[in-house]
Amino acid sequence: MINYLKSFFLYEIVRGMALTLKYFFKPKVTINYPYEKSPISPRFKGEHALRRYENGEERCIACKLCEAICPAQAIVIEADEREDGSRRTTRYDIDMTKCIYCGLCQEACPVDAIVEGPNFEFASLTHTALIYDKERLLQNGDRWEQALASKLHKDYEYR
């Protein structure tokens, strides 16, 4: 009987409208994206970058740990040995369409060569533009070196 009275007096509709009015006058939580941007966490995983040492030499020692640990198999590395016995990469490609941004490559790297930077706006109209070669990754690293170094410094105690 009580259910009949509730449905007769449209109790559920009034209750729903009250809830709507409650949230209607609260401040909005959305942002106008292209013009406003929300703050990014220091642990954000965005576009990849290869870092260099202060003297300009690339950090990557071609150990291929990032290639081995990548669950999406998005990283391809080819390396040559130099005269002094050390190895350096001749090819370092990341297919960003395969990448799942898990950060395992960054965690596996013993010299902090591959990192995920602060950029999340790198959409493209072609598939080939999302296959990053070594030069593009090094350019990303040069562009964001200050931000990457401070991010790694903040995160150091958790690694």
UniProtKB/Swiss-Prot annotation:
GO terms for cellular component: plasma membrane. [4Fe-4S] cluster 2 binds at C70, C99, C102, C105. Residues 51-80, 90-119 form the 4Fe-4S ferredoxin-type domain. Keywords: 4Fe-4S, Cell inner membrane, Cell membrane, Iron, Iron-sulfur, Membrane, Metal-binding, NAD, Quinone, Repeat, Translocase, Ubiquinone. It is found in: Cell inner membrane. It is a peripheral membrane protein. [4Fe-4S] cluster 1 binds at C60, C63, C66, C109. GO terms for biological process: aerobic respiration. It catalyses: a quinone + NADH + 5 H(+)(in) = a quinol + NAD(+) + 4 H(+)(out). Binds 2 [4Fe-4S] clusters per subunit. It is an enzyme of class 7 (translocase). Its EC number is 7.1.1.-. InterPro entries: 4Fe4S_Fe-S-bd (IPR017896), 4Fe4S_Fe_S_CS (IPR017900), NADH_quinone_OxRdtase_chainI (IPR010226). Pfam families: Fer4_7. The keyword Cytoplasm does not apply. Its cofactor is [4Fe-4S] cluster. GO terms for molecular function: 4 iron, 4 sulfur cluster binding; iron ion binding; NADH:ubiquinone reductase (non-electrogenic) activity; quinone binding. The keyword Iron applies. NDH-1 shuttles electrons from NADH, via FMN and iron-sulfur (Fe-S) centers, to quinones in the respiratory chain. The immediate electron acceptor for the enzyme in this species is believed to be ubiquinone. Couples the redox reaction to proton translocation (for every two electrons transferred, four hydrogen ions are translocated across the cytoplasmic membrane), and thus conserves the redox energy in a proton gradient. PANTHER family: NADH DEHYDROGENASE [UBIQUINONE] IRON-SULFUR PROTEIN 8, MITOCHONDRIAL, NADH DEHYDROGENASE UBIQUINONE IRON-SULFUR PROTEIN 8, MITOCHONDRIAL. Belongs to the complex I 23 kDa subunit family. NDH-1 is composed of 14 different subunits. Subunits NuoA, H, J, K, L, M, N constitute the membrane sector of the complex. This is NADH-quinone oxidoreductase subunit I. It comes from Rickettsia peacockii (strain Rustic).
